[in-house]
């Protein structure tokens, strides 16, 4: 069913007034001198230009496209400016142009109207994702609630789902039919994950085991991986660029039993068991610099060094309740590995490693530093932004949600963070400093998950209210309402090539959405 937006509360009305106060621009604001410089190469475009002091981000984008001769097929850009502190020892700050030049640089005092401002630009993406607008199919097959879903890292033609009927299923999204039913688990399939080379699917179950599958044949690759004493809560693959030559990516699993295990997927042996958490581990992520991050119901996040046999090197303590989820600023690069939006496959393992490392470093560079940032979401209604390689203290405490935060995700370029909460709202935050940007309202029940489009301009959410909604990050508004499911929607994913969105939930139907 289509949902009606509820009337705004007093708090929402107050929040809505804040952006208006920021947007007041002096009438006598003079023109300023700017120049465009490519962030990656340092090349200047067009020399010095005089522009209005209140020029908006969109107008800057139009101007740059004119200078580059791409007005007919405009490229979306992000703009930032580096600010040196008053003392030589002060760190250099990177300020994003998020609204207009005046509110981002001049009003806060970073620049005056007499300065020449160098704007560093970088393309948001090399392609444009269209918002999905319709359900292309509703496919039956699962006999119980669908709990998890994931597109392949290299194509939108293949997708896997896990359900409460003890099976996972691989779907052919081109013909919109089921390909293989993955039978072997004896209880609910709680998590599914594609290896970053697209050659193996891992499933984790409430039967305490993990199984590996061949996505082409649907056959189980050997026996189940056994060792956990309680159910599997999440899975994470070793990034391609860290895999030793001649080896296959290893797999990390987290469990309700409070441990994390590292599995050799060829010999099927558990290499390390990492103990230390005193309660269920809700989420595990394998980072791009040889570290593993885990969030737990013991209210802590732990950082583990895989190169030192899984030794715990940091414990991050700030949350006052369960840690439900965590996301890395490099998640997208780690997911796609050596692929890109075209799905072109490298010809050799060496080429794959090189391309995967390029993808990873490109994301780090876009984010303004070479380190992975991490955001954690909790039952305490808050999130924390961390630089786990530098400090055990958070960069920012992110507050605003009125109920538990269930899901959190960095945008593919690491510039934004989006959070989904049981307070029916989605919030957008700055990925560098954790500052609040906007609230997306429209769902009338708990929001379970969010997924980004690869070009960072759109996101899709799924909710208890039976709908999916597509949001425009630039306008901060609802783009498309997607009714269709007959009950709660628990899982959503957006394919890397941007062509499709998949969803599943309590009505047992897999839905594919396209434009």
From Swiss-Prot:
InterPro entries: G-protein_beta_WD-40_rep (IPR020472), NLE (IPR012972), WD40/YVTN_repeat-like_dom_sf (IPR015943), WD40_repeat_CS (IPR019775), WD40_repeat_dom_sf (IPR036322), WD40_rpt (IPR001680). Residues 20-128 are annotated as: Interaction with MDN1. WD repeats lie at residues 141-181, 184-223, 227-273, 276-314, 352-396, 400-439, 442-481, 484-515. Gene3D superfamilies: YVTN repeat-like/Quinoprotein amine dehydrogenase. Its main location: nucleus. It is found in: Nucleus, Nucleolus. Involved in ribosome biogenesis. Required for processing and efficient intra-nuclear transport of pre-60S ribosomal subunits. Interacts with the AAA-ATPase Midasin (MDN1/REA1), which is essential for the ATP-dependent dissociation of a group of nonribosomal factors from the pre-60S particle. Belongs to the NLE1/RSA4 family. This is Ribosome assembly protein 4. The gene is RSA4.
